[in-house]
Amino acid sequence: MQADFGEYWMHRGDTRRVKVYFFASVMSHSRHKFTYFSKTPFTSELAIYAHQLAFRFYGGKPREVIYDQDRVFVRDENLGDVVLTKAFQAFVSSEHFQCVFCRKSDPQSKGKVENVVKYIKYNFLRGREFTNMEMLNESSVRWLARTANGLPHGTTKRIPAEAFKDEQPFLAPYVGTPAHPRDGMKEYLVRRDNTINFHSHFYNVPTGTYNGSGTFVWACAKEGHVEIYSNETGKQLVRHPLARIPGEAVLDETIRRTKLPS
C-alpha cells in the first residue's frame, strides 16, 4: 500500500472558500483506493485514525506501507535510519506492518498514490461545493465505489474493486476499532514578526509565513511541545518545547534564518 496527504480549497455556497485536508491510500496491485477528509491538518494521531479507517475499508492490513518522510510520521533521521514519532511508532508496533520511507530525492517510488492525490483533487473535489465535513466524507465513499474503484484503471485496464478480490486475501486481519483523536487543533493568527500567541506565550514560525493580515496557522499542544502546521499545505512547520514562564517567547533561531520555499 502507498499513502500520502493532500489539500484543496473548496467553495462554499456563500462564496467563501474552505481548505480541506485529506489522506489517500492505494493498494499497489489492484489500485483499490481510499480517502479520508479532515478540516484540520494531519497530526500523527489523526493520520493513525485515517490508517485505521483505511484498514477497516480494505478489510485487512497490508504487510508494507510506502510513505514520504513526512513529519507526521518521522521525528528525526539518524545515519539514514528514520526515527518515527512516538505515537506512530506505537501504532506500527501494535499493528505489525512495515514502513518504507522514500528517499527525499526519489518521490517517484510512491508515484501510484501521488496520482491518486491528483485524481481526488481534479475528479472528486474540483467543482464540488462544500457543505460540511461529514457530507464530504460520505460523498467520497460513494465516489470511491462509483468512480475511483468502479471504473477500469488507465494503466491496468482492470476495475480496481474487481482486482482487489484477488489481493484482499493476502492482507493481515484488522480487528481494531477506529477512534478519532482529540488533539485540540485550532487556528492562530500569525503576527508581522512571524510569531503566534499560543496560550499567552509567543512561538515563532519560519520567516515568510506571515503573508499579510489574516495569515493563520494551525497549532496544538502535544507531549510537552507545541506543533504548528501550515494552513496552506497542512505540513508541520515547526515543533517547539512548551514555554514555562508566563509571557515567554520561544524562538527557534534556525527557522528565523530560513525562509519558506516560494
Question: Where are the predicted features?
Answer:
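Mobile-element integrase/transposase regions
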Residues: 1-34, 43-46, 93, 185-198
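RNase H-like two-metal-ion nuclease catalytic core shared by retroviral integrases
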Residues: 67, 78-79, 99-121, 136
